[in-house]
Amino acid sequence: MKITSISVQQKNKERYNIFIDEKYNFSVDEEVLARYQLMKGKALTEAEIEEIKQADMVRKGLNKAINFLSHRVRSEKEIRDYLKKQEMEAFAIDEILKKLADMDYINDLEFAELYTKTQIKTTLKGPRTIERELVEKGLTREIISQVIEEYSDEAQLENATKQAIKIMKRNNKSAKKMLQQKIITDLIQKGYTSELAKTAATEATSEIDIADEADILQKQVEKTMRKNKRYKPSIAKQKTITSLMQKGFSYDTIQSYLTENEISFEEEE
C-alpha cells in the first residue's frame, strides 16, 4: 500500500488527509505527519497504518487536554474523565496523561494546594466539605491530609462566623436558642465540626440580648395571634403557644409574656 496523495484539510490547516492507493484512508496532525515522514509514494503496511492512527489519536487527545487545561488547573482524574467523554481509548488516555505529567501540566499536589487556598479565600465552606470535594476530584488521602492543614483554626472560625451571621439574618424571627441551633446545624452541613459550629453560633449571636429577644417575641405573638384569631379562644391560644415554641421560645417564657402583658384570647363582646 502506497500513499498516493496528501492534502491539507480546509477547516484545520494543521491536519492532513492521507490517501492510500487513490482512496482516502485517514487523517493526521502535522506533528504526526512529520514524525512518521509521511509523503507521496511512501509504502505502508497495515500495522504501520494502525500505529500512525494510534499516534494521531494520542496527539489529538493531547491537544484537547491542553486546551481543557487552559481554562484552569485540573486534577489527573478530571483530565482522565474529560478524555473519556471525548471517547479516547484507554491506551491513548494513559499515554496522554504521561505526556502531560512530563510537561508539568499535571501535579495533583499543586492542584490540591491551589484549590484549597481558593476555597478558603473565596467561599465559606468548612474543611470537611473541601475534603469531600478533593476526594471527588481524585486526590489521594495523603495529599488531602497535607493540604487541608492550610485551613487554620483561625480561618475556619472566621469563615464559620461569617456564614453564621448570614444564617442569623435569614432567621431573625426565631428565639436565640433556636437560632443558635439552626446555625450549628447549617454549619455542620457545610463541613464544619460541631465544636467549631457551636463557637461560631455563640460568636454570631453574642449581641442578641434579652431586650432583643423580647422584641422578637412581641412581634411573633402579635403575628401569630392575628393568624389564629379565626379559631375559638382555647384553640387560638393553643396554636399560638405551639407556634411560638416551634420558633424556640420556652413555654414558661411565653406564659410569662402573655401574663405580664395581660394578653387574653377571650372573644370580644
From Swiss-Prot:
Its main location: cytoplasm. HAMAP family: RecX. The keyword Cytoplasm applies. The lineage of its organism: Bacteria, Bacillati, Bacillota, Bacilli, Bacillales. Belongs to the RecX family. The gene is recX. Keywords: Cytoplasm. One of its GO terms (cellular component) is cytoplasm. Modulates RecA activity. It is found in: Cytoplasm. GO terms for biological process: regulation of DNA repair. This is Regulatory protein RecX. It holds the Pfam family RecX_HTH1.
